[in-house]
Amino acid sequence: MSMAIPKNKDNLNLGLAAVSAVGGALLFYAYTGGRIGKLNLPVDLVTFAMVSGGLYGLGFFLAPKVLIEMNFSAPVDKYHEFVARFSGIHMVLMTYFLYGNLFVNPFQVACLWMGCLAFLGPTQAALYMEPKQTATGHIPAHVLFFLGGVLAVTS
């Protein structure tokens, strides 16, 4: 991950990067055992991570070109598709491992997984890449990680 000065300095990209970064920070805080309150919500973080991570993973595995074109203003080549498919299958496997309760502490794993993805995914994309920041493009990723962070620290 580059620590260079952000390439994208417009308010939309900086604001959305902040949204997903706050979500990532909340997820890391929850990983350490930190909480900021208790909400009785109908979904927990592990379920949320399985659904959102599993759907993104399936999308990147089965239709990488579609997802890349939906989210970024860059030409897609066979290398992009390869890396997207490779990432997608790992997301699907993580979802399976969470679902199968194959971790000692699925909550901590979900926090760590989603926290890392928040920073390496939408936050980095908003700061350094050419994401399509639209409601049908990249904006939902920022919101998903923020919601994941809120779920994590209020469980």
Which sequence ranges carry the predicted segments?
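Membrane-helix boundary connector in multi-pass membrane proteins
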Residues: 103-109, 121-139
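Alpha-helical membrane-associated segments of multi-pass integral membrane proteins
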Residues: 134-151
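Core segments of alpha-helical transmembrane spans in multipass integral membrane proteins
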Residues: 50-60, 78-103, 115-118
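Membrane-interfacial loop-to-transmembrane alpha-helix junctions, especially the N-terminal start
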Residues: 43-46, 105-114
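Cytosolic juxtamembrane helix and N-cap/initiation of the first transmembrane helix
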Residues: 5-21, 27-53, 78
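Membrane-water interface at the C-terminal end of transmembrane alpha helices
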Residues: 25-33, 125-126, 146-155
